[in-house]
């Protein structure tokens, strides 16, 4: 396989149009079409479906796209590694963060430390759901992601970071420092969608106790959730880091769910299909050192060994 053809193919799939891809790649469309035809001949498979609206990958094309992104990324990392021997690390490092994770507390320390220690490295931070972040890792669009993990994901390597207890957060009728799950079942709740690790843990706990949650709304945005809780319409369940942040913003209270005790594991995820670039590895070490500090936002969290 020719690396240039793979690069062309990935760009076509990313854009979804041969014409636009040809413009971006500065190559004539007939020549680009010939490169695709040659690649399809090498694979002995049709890779693209051409329609009036553009092009979409076939099943074989989707498989090649995934592998091609990994191959191109590894080639880029290899070149960077060679170029950086004896030189200052430089380049971009992309990190995904799940909303409401403890990692949010180290965002500014991370940016400041990288700026001080790796001045030529640009950190790109993206916030999204855990499922979306894993998909981006597999697609080669992120170097690493910090999220609450529910179960192993094929193609993903997870490094446990710490555990956080779950807290009930609200602004009306504070139950005290701790609360029983039966009391939570009587409250109106705002929770994330069912693919969220928090939602899955809450659902599991309610099912085991044969209780039903009174969910009055599903909210993904922390900003919207803060406004909803501040209004007094209902309460929510969050890991300690997110609970403390929302509690302060909404001028509310937080109570640890103690019967039963509930927690979530925070993990650093990376793709198993390739190694990190030198600059990404350096940023990873900084991130791990920050998360491993005894206190985040002046609170003790349970580190995972």
Curated annotation (Swiss-Prot):
Domain of life, per UniProt, equals Bacteria
The alphabetized UniProt keywords are: Activator, DNA-binding, Nitrate assimilation, Repressor, Transcription, Transcription regulation
MF terms in GO: DNA binding; DNA-binding transcription factor activity
Tell me which Gene3D superfamilies the record gives: 3.40.190.290, Winged helix-like DNA-binding domain superfamily/Winged helix DNA-binding domain (1.10.10.10)
Every HTH lysR-type domain range: 1-58
Give GO BP annotations, semicolon-separated.
nitrate assimilation; regulation of DNA-templated transcription initiation
Q: Which residues bind DNA?
A: 18-37
Establish whether keyword DNA-binding is in the entry: yes
User: Using the chain's own numbering, where are the disulfide bonds?
Assistant: none
> Transmembrane helix among the record's keywords?
no
Pfam name, any one? HTH_1
Could you tell me what this protein does?
Answer: Transcriptional activator for the hut, put and ure operons and repressor for the gdh and gltB operons in response to nitrogen limitation. Negative regulator of its own expression.
Show the NCBIfam families listed in the entry. Answer: PRK11233.1
Family the UniProt entry places it in = Belongs to the LysR transcriptional regulatory family.
PANTHER family membership? NITROGEN ASSIMILATION REGULATORY PROTEIN NAC, TRANSCRIPTIONAL REGULATORY PROTEIN NAC-RELATED
Query: What's the protein name?
Result: Nitrogen assimilation regulatory protein nac
Gene transcribed to yield this protein: nac
């Amino acid at each position: 396989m020719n690396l240039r053809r793979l690069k062309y193919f990935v760009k076509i799939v990313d854009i979804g149009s041969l014409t636009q891809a040809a413009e971006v790649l500065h190559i004539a469309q007939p020549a680009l079409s010939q490169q695709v035809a040659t690649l399809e001949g090498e694979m002995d498979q049709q890779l693209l479906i051409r329609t009036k609206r553009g092009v979409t990958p076939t099943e074989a094309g989707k498989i090649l796209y995934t592998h091609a992104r990994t191959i191109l990324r590894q080639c880029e990392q290899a070149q960077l590694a060679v170029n950086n021997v004896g030189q200052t690390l430089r380049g971009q490092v992309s990190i995904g963060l799940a909303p409401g994770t403890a990692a949010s507390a180290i965002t500014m320390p991370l940016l400041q430390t990288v700026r001080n220690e790796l001045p030529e490295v640009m950190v790109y931070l993206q916030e999204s759901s855990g499922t979306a972040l894993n998909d981006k890792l597999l697609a080669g669009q992120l170097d690493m992601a910090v999220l609450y993990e529910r179960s192993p994901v094929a193609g993903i390597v997870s490094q446990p970071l710490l555990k956080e207890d779950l807290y009930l957060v609200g602004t009306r009728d504070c139950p005290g420092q701790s609360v029983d799950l039966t009391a939570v079942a009587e409250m109106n709740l705002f929770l994330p969608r069912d693919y969220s690790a928090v939602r899955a843990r809450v659902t599991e706990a309610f099912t085991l106790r044969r209780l039903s949650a009174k969910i009055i709304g599903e909210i993904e945005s922390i900003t919207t959730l803060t406004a909803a809780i501040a209004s007094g319409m209902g309460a929510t369940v969050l890991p300690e880091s997110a609970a403390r942040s929302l509690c302060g913003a909404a001028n509310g209270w937080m109570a640890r769910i103690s019967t039963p005790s509930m927690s979530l594991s925070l993990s650093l995820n990376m793709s198993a299909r390739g190694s990190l670039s030198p600059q990404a590895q350096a940023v990873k070490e900084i991130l791990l050192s920050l998360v491993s500090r005894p206190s985040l936002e002046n609170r003790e969290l349970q580190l995972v060994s």
